Amino acid sequence: FRTDTDNEIVADSSSGGRTSYKNAGKTRRQGVELSVDQQFAGNWRAKAAWTWLDATYRSEVCGDATCEGNRIPGIARNMGFASLGWMPEEGWYAGADVRYMSNIMANDENSAKAPSYTVAGLNTGYKFNYGNWMMDLFGRVDNLFDRNYVGSVIVNESNNRYYEPAPGRNYGVGLSVAYQFN
């Protein structure tokens, strides 16, 4: 894919929780997305997805500094996801997944960036049907290895405090209930 944009509105500066915006002139986003979702050997299921995204300024936006050709801040160039799980239609299921995010520029000058990271997760649950009702009792653990990483950036933060931490290891449980009409 490839998209060229004129007068895109982007973050100019952020200070004290307030962000002002500006027109960036010309920008370009080009890349490739690939994915596979495959069931095999009965109830095993594998998924994988990868995105390469080159998002750049195509005209000057920095005033004193030269930013033409720089990466647009807040956008990762590479993102990946993979999972493998035992996924029967009913009964116990379980799986594992991994997510990757490449470094993310934090300012227009590309002088600050959040480092890349990889995190893993596990999930399990039990699905069952009762008449027209389908229930799924599930749980998952995210950031399984309790990695410290930057979860998001504040683009063009005026005090150079660009980085916001991601949550540590966290857990979730839930119940999904659905009714199928005949």
Which residues make up each language-model segment?
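Generic secretory/membrane-interface signal
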Residues: F1, G17, T27, Q39, ...
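Outer-membrane beta-barrel translocator domains and adjoining extracellular loop/strand segments
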Residues: N7-T19, L53, Y57-T66, M105-A112, ...
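Gram-negative outer-membrane beta-barrel transporters
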Residues: R2, K22-N107, S176-A178
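Conserved C-terminal beta-signal and adjacent last beta-strands/turns
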Residues: R71-N182
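Flexible, active-site-proximal loop/turn residues at the rims of small-molecule/cofactor binding pockets
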Residues: R2-D4, F145
